Amino acid sequence: MNDMNLFEAMYSQRSFTRFRPDPVPKEAIDKMIDAAIRAPNGGNRQPWEFIAITDPEVIAQVGGVYKDVWLNAMGHEAPPDETPAYKAARYLANHMPEVPAMILICAVHDGAAPTAPSSQDEPFVRGSQASSVWPVAQNLFLAARALGLGTRLTTAHLRGEQRVKDILGIPDHVETVMLTPLGYPRGNFGPTQRKPAVEVTSYNRYGNRVT
C-alpha cells in the first residue's frame, strides 16, 4: 500500500472490467473509505453510507441482479457492431457475480436540512444529499488507484434497486447511488485518453476558448 502522487493517480486511473481472483484485504477497503469520506459535501451533513461486499455469496446475489438488469436492458446477445466500450460493459455484466469485492455507495436521506425546513424543499435536499456522494466516489476511486486496485463506476443496478436493497437490508430512507466492483485488475493502469482540456474550457463566456 504505497502512497502515490495525486496527479499520477488522476492521470493513470482507469475503469476495469476484468479482475484477478485475489481477495481484497479489509485494510485496503477501510483505507479507501477513510479517504473517501474526506470529500466535500453539502452542509457537511456527510449523508453517505458504504456497504463493502466481500462475501462471495452476497457478491453473487448482488452481481446476479446487476447481470440480470443489464442484459435485460441491453440484450443478451451482442450486436455485430457493438463498440469496444459496450463489449467491456457486457463482459463486466456477465462476470459481476464473480468479482472479488464490491462497494455500494448510498445516500442517506434523513429529513430536511436546517436551511430548507419546508416540505416543498425536500426534492432540493434529497438532490443535495445524493450529489454529495459523487465527490466521495471519486475519492474512493483515487484511493483505490493508489493502492493498485481497480474500480469501475456503475449504476445499472438501479434498474433493480429494490432487489439489491432487499438482499443487503437497506432501509427505505437510504438511496443506493453507485456500485463499483473492486479488485486487483487484469490489465494496466493509464494513461487515459481524453479530449484536450482546451476543447472543453471557456474563459469568462461560453465558447471563448483561450489557447
Roles of regions detected by a PLM:
Residues 9, 15-16, 176-211:
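C-terminal helix-cap and adjacent tail motif
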Residues 47-48, 99-102, 177:
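Short, surface-exposed beta-edge/turn micro-motifs
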